[in-house]
């Protein structure tokens, strides 16, 4: 059995998977990391077997007016990611189909979830979702980023289900490409993020920051942030001066998205 870690997205999506890959290899497990071509050197430096998915990060957004709009709007940014996924879906689907074998263990973030569900069903694989932000459906505000209501609320539950549905849907082009290739079953409930083959969920956030919600799915584990250690890195003098100038700052963020 190989642990196939699927990291579709930015550096914030890749680094936790790379940290997990290194930990698994330290335990003697077979690991294969799938990611964008841009990250092959980082995987090589970490000693992790890597296979690119035949596509690269989005280039600079043009025209400049659209780039400014994307920086200021999560909606526009999401639409640009959706367009990129649509254009890259065929290459990613082919890479997944080649890399995954019966009995493997798939670990994927949200953008690869629909496609990995299809492969898990078709090839008898175990599937674990790696959530890098507290966005699982829940009624409890303390366990949900961007919760519209404090405490427990049905509005929170409805909001989080809608966010979940929209996030999983962004990866549907990859699942559809798999379906057309014959590597997955027809896209139905599994592609919409309902029911299916997820055997467990890892919430890679600190339990001190994100308490476990009572209504999270069974098998959900809050592990803390998966940190890729870089002992050779040294902070630049300007950063050291900043850190020494007062009380230690507190950064709160999930994945590659700063929150506060």
Regions found by a protein language model. Name each.
Residues 36-41, 45-249, 254-259:
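Nucleotide-sugar-dependent glycosyltransferase catalytic domains
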């Amino acid at each position: 059995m190989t642990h196939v870690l699927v990291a579709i997205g930015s550096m914030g999506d890749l680094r936790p998977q790379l940290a997990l890959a290194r930990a698994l290899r330290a335990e003697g497990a077979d690991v294969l990391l799938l990611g964008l071509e841009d990250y092959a050197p980082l995987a090589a430096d970490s000693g992790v077997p890597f296979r690119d998915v035949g596509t690269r990060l989005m280039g600079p957004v043009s025209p400049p007016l659209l780039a400014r709009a994307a920086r200021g709007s999560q909606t526009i940014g999401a639409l640009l990611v959706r367009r990129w996924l649509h254009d890259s879906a065929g290459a990613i689907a082919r890479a997944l189909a080649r890399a995954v074998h019966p009995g493997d263990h798939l670990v994927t973030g949200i953008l690869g979830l629909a496609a990995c569900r299809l492969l898990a069903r078709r090839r008898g694989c175990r599937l674990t979702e790696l959530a890098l932000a507290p966005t699982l459906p829940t009624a409890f505000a303390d366990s949900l980023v961007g919760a519209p209501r404090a405490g427990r609320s049905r509005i929170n539950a409805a909001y989080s289900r809608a966010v979940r549905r929209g996030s999983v849907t962004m990866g549907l082009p990859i699942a559809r490409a798999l379906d057309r290739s014959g590597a997955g079953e027809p896209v139905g409930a599994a592609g919409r993020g309902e029911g299916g083959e997820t055997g467990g969920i890892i919430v890679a956030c600190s339990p001190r920051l994100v308490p476990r919600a009572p209504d999270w799915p069974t098998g959900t584990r809050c592990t803390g942030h998966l940190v890729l250690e870089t002992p050779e890195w040294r902070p630049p003098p300007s950063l050291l001066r900043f850190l020494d100038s007062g009380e230690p700052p507190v950064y709160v963020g999930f994945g590659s998205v700063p929150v506060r």
